[in-house]
A protein has these predicted regions:
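Conserved N-terminal structural module of periplasmic/extracytoplasmic solute-binding proteins
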Residues: 3-15, 19-112, 125, 362, ...
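Long, aromatic- and glycine/proline-rich binding clefts that accommodate carbohydrate-like moieties
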Residues: 65, 139, 314-315, 364-414, ...
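A structural signal for short loop-to-beta-strand junctions that line the ligand-binding cleft
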Residues: 86, 95-97, 127-165, 197, ...
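Hinge/lid segment of periplasmic solute-binding proteins
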Residues: 103-155, 212, 312-315, 381
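Extracytoplasmic/periplasmic solute-binding protein
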Residues: 145-151, 156, 181-241, 274
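Conserved C-terminal helix/tail region of periplasmic/extracytoplasmic solute-binding proteins
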Residues: 166, 172, 191, 254, ...
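Extracytoplasmic/periplasmic substrate-recognition and gating elements
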Residues: 168, 254-259, 299-367
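Glycine-centered hinge/linker elements that transmit conformational signals in sensory
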Residues: 184-187, 231-267, 312, 316-319
Length: 453
């Protein structure tokens, strides 16, 4: 059930925004502006944030006569968006007042001075009590201050086509206990329905965080190893789990169980997965996120009324079935305030409006997000809106989060390099892992790493 975009807070008549001085004339720096600049990602099938921001612009301007919200949708896949946003933030003339910020970049961007702390606002915001504590922590900087207000979170699992599984003689519901079960199912699909692509796992440099987090880390955290020792604050090298995770990628791509490397390295492969391969029955399994059904809703870019009848979900198993038996990865996005915002009160009021109870719920439903507000997650309309919400919320107990460090982005990039070298057959998993280890030591230094061997 769609909820209307209605403000639950009486917005103050915000004072006029002040333009950053960027011209040679000294008087220009003091010219008042009535515009709030809001930057966010818009790419392919991912239109939900764009729709939400358009609705929030209309609501904010209706309640704040004389103020204008300038929307700056940035076209680009996740890494491209981050690069373009960073370029905007480097100049006062282009830096946004409000920005759509990935939780894993909050620390690095706040350390870089791009973001403004929000604690003085959250302390007086009654809605803040409705946000789960672990969601709040996702918006913290390395200094312990709040820089981002969470919009929603997510988990990841295996989406599978029940009709194709039945056609291949595989049991439905699918309940893999080990990696081998997943690969065996893919091999069966290949043998029984050769025209169907068995399995997609995002991999390679072009996919950025979708590859490193959604592909590789979904595997690694199903082993006994991890990327980072949070207690000792050291990045791990020399782990068997790292090599084995690359081995899974090798099995998929060198074993013809997934897309060709050329297909997988296309920046638009995510749009193909959601808009064509899954709806058209060309792909049997995809390791993907809880949000993807939003593409198939009536409000999405590729409506597919039968999606819930056709698609099933299975938790990603641990490597050999060891406890807890399954694994997942969680992330999420926030709304953050630019450190250079000249009217921070107005920027905050936009954030508070966009993420109040009704508007957060409307966005979470449209974008198939796991709610981070208790009053949304407990709402009957939210619970009834998507038949997968229960499954994806249940696997939160198995989930893991990316290391919350300012240098994670560089490590993530090194992971995608290792994945690409293996998927294209240029290196063995052992060789690629060794190169990764050397790269991490080069980035962090010997003192910031530890070998498990």
């Amino acid at each position: 059930m769609k909820k209307s975009y209605v403000s639950a807070v009486a917005l103050t008549a915000a004072a006029a925004l002040v333009l950053s001085g960027c011209s040679a004339g000294g008087d220009e720096a003091s010219v008042e502006s009535t515009t709030i600049k809001v930057a966010y990602q818009k790419f392919g099938a991912f239109i939900q944030v764009d729709n939400h921001m358009k609705a929030m612009k209309e609501a904010f301007e209706a309640e704040n006569e004389g103020l204008t919200v300038e929307l700056v949708p940035i076209e680009g896949q996740e890494n491209d968006y981050a690069t373009k946003l960073a370029l905007m933030n480097q100049s006062p003339a282009t830096a946004p007042d409000v920005m759509y910020e990935d939780t894993f970049r909050v620390q690095s961007d706040s350390d870089a001075g791009y973001l403004a702390p929000l604690d003085e606002y959250t302390e007086g915001w009654s809605d803040w009590d409705s946000f789960y504590d672990n969601a709040k922590s996702a918006g913290l900087g390395s200094d312990g201050l709040t820089y981002g207000i969470p919009m929603g979170t997510d988990t990841r699992a295996i989406w599978y086509n029940k009709d194709l599984f039945a056609q291949a003689g595989l049991e439905v519901p699918f309940d893999p206990q080990t990696w081998e079960d997943v690969l065996d199912a893919a091999a069966t699909i290949k043998a029984e329905i050769p025209d169907v692509m068995p399995l997609n796992v995002y991999s390679g440099k072009a996919q950025g965080e979708a590859a490193s987090m959604q592909g590789f880390e979904m595997l690694l955290y199903g082993t006994s190893d991890s990327l980072y020792d949070a207690d000792d604050q050291k990045w791990m090298t020399g782990s068997d789990g790292f090599v084995d995770s690359l081995g899974f990628i090798e099995d998929v791509y060198q074993g013809d169980l997934g897309p060709t490397p050329e297909q997988a390295l296309d920046k638009n492969v995510g749009n193909l997965v959601l808009g064509e391969w899954l709806p058209q029955g060309e792909l049997a399994m995809a390791v993907d996120g809880s949000w993807i059904s939003g593409t198939w809703l009536e409000t999405g870019t590729a409506p597919w009324p039968e999606w819930n009848d056709v698609m099933g979900q299975a938790a990603m198993p641990t490597q050999t079935g060891d406890a807890p038996g399954a694994t997942s990865m969680s992330g999420g996005w926030t709304l953050a305030m630019g450190s250079g915002a000249q009217n921070k009160d107005a920027a905050w009021e936009f954030i508070a409006l966009a993420l109040n109870k009704d508007n957060a719920q409307s966005y979470d439903i449209a974008a198939s997000q796991i709610a981070v507000r208790s009053d949304v997650s407990e709402d009957a309309d939210y619970q009834a809106a998507n038949p997968t919400f229960g499954f994806f919320s249940e696997i939160v107990k198995f989930t893991h989060f990316r290391p919350a460090t300012s240098d994670y982005a560089q490590i993530s990039s090194a992971i995608t390099v290792a994945m690409e070298s293996v998927m294209t057959g240029q290196q063995s998993p052992e060789e690629a892992a060794a190169v990764y280890d050397d790269t991490v030591i080069g980035i962090i230094g010997e003192d910031g790493t530890a070998s498990v061997k």
